[in-house]
Design a protein with these regions (language model features):
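Residues that cap or anchor secondary-structure elements
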Residues: 1-186
Length: 186
């Protein structure tokens, strides 16, 4: 509940074989796993689902029927309520990509949101993105986007990645209205 795992795989050997019209009997693929771990999250945060799908799933794990589940709901958006005190986290499917965002309740402290990485070296790029470098490739988190909905209008809030302490990252913000929720869309 406190981390994301990203798997990077180098498919260049397969691409080369395809280009050369060769069949590889035992292709060797190299992968790297990058872990993004959020620090200090609420271990008792309540899972929630939004935008329910019209279908459900059934899971049959082994022959022990006590481990089976049927009619499990599917959702277009899921998340945790109070992931941090006063902050909810959501994941959604956005055009075949998974996105996550935070909703900070009025008066809550977005500085609680902090994370570190294992398996990659992180660098904040001068243009505001966060670059994760591995031996086989990079992941680029574009500059974060933050806003507030006030009187039916979306008001932009300046937001940037910041290195809170060595290897620990978070967000910094420009001025915003503490009386309204703040949405952070990394």
């Amino acid at each position: 509940q406190d981390r994301f795992l990203y798997q990077l795989t180098d498919f260049s050997a397969l691409e080369k074989a395809h280009h050369e019209q060769k069949i590889l009997e035992n292709p060797l693929l190299t992968s790297r796993l990058v872990q993004q771990r959020f620090k200090g999250v609420n271990p008792h945060a309540q899972a929630m689902g939004h935008k329910p799908a019209k279908h459900a799933y059934n899971f049959f794990l082994g022959s022990d029927s006590s481990r089976w589940a049927s009619g499990v709901g599917a959702y277009g958006e899921v998340g945790y309520q109070d992931y941090y005190p006063g902050i909810d986290m959501f994941w959604k499917n956005d055009q075949a990509n998974y996105k996550y965002l935070f909703v900070v309740a009025p008066g809550s402290a977005p500085a609680q949101i902090m994370w570190d990485y294992t398996g990659a070296d992180a660098v904040i790029h001068k243009k505001g993105s966060l670059l994760l470098k591995t031996a086989i490739g990079e992941i680029r988190e574009e500059q974060p986007f933050a806003y507030q909905e006030i009187n039916g209008k979306q008001i932009m809030v300046a937001c940037a990645y910041t290195e809170v302490s060595e290897g620990v990252y978070g967000y910094s913000f420009g001025a915003y209205d503490l009386a309204y929720p703040l949405v952070i869309d990394p």
